[in-house]
A protein has these predicted regions:
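Terminal accessory carbohydrate-recognition/targeting modules of carbohydrate-active enzymes
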Residues: 1-170
């Protein structure tokens, strides 16, 4: 199935669907070993205590594009009820097998709001969900998904502070 927004470097290819969910992660060969298998990796937003997964069915207005003359995504996600607009830029490093995401949040409310982002991974490492393992590394404050010789490290950085604050595996 064609995807709406692909980014990659020849060794790592990531495809997004029309609702800005990751659906395919090909590594180390483009077109072979899809570690997502078409299953969505969701992205969620909580404003104060009101939570929504990103997607048109959840009330999001979604505009997908690339930054001019680049393979850097520029997705604009607006939710009127939550009162926020997110500008999300994604890229795969040109030389390394690294996927990066930058999220800028604009609050449309008259008062300050607590905004939390949620990243949900649903790996099918080596094209099978059997034997996938996820573990939290407290020393580095990262989550690692692995099976066999394939490892995927998940990390975040907020205001120059690296590390995952909350996580769940299972």
């Amino acid at each position: 199935m064609p995807r709406d927004l692909p980014i990659g470097n020849g060794h790592l290819l990531i495809n997004f669907d029309a609702d800005f969910r990751i659906r395919d992660i090909y590594y180390p060969f483009v077109g072979k070993e899809n570690h997502a298998g078409g299953h969505p990796f969701r992205f969620g937003v909580m404003v104060d205590k009101d939570f929504r997964w990103v997607g048109r069915a959840e009330g999001w207005q979604i505009e997908l594009a690339y930054e001019p003359d680049t393979l850097v995504t520029c997705a604009t996600l607006t939710h009127a009820e939550l009162g926020v607009t997110l500008t999300v830029r994604d890229c795969v490093d040109f030389h390394e097998t690294v996927f990066l995401r930058q999220v800028q949040i604009r609050n449309h409310r008259d008062q300050a709001a607590e905004v939390r982002l949620f990243f949900h991974q649903d790996f099918r490492i080596s094209e099978s969900e059997i034997g996938d393992t996820a573990a939290y590394d407290p020393r580095n404050r990262t989550v690692v998904h692995y099976k066999g010789e394939r490892y995927f490290l998940i990390n975040v950085m907020v205001d120059e502070r690296a590390g995952v604050d909350h996580y769940a595996t299972g």
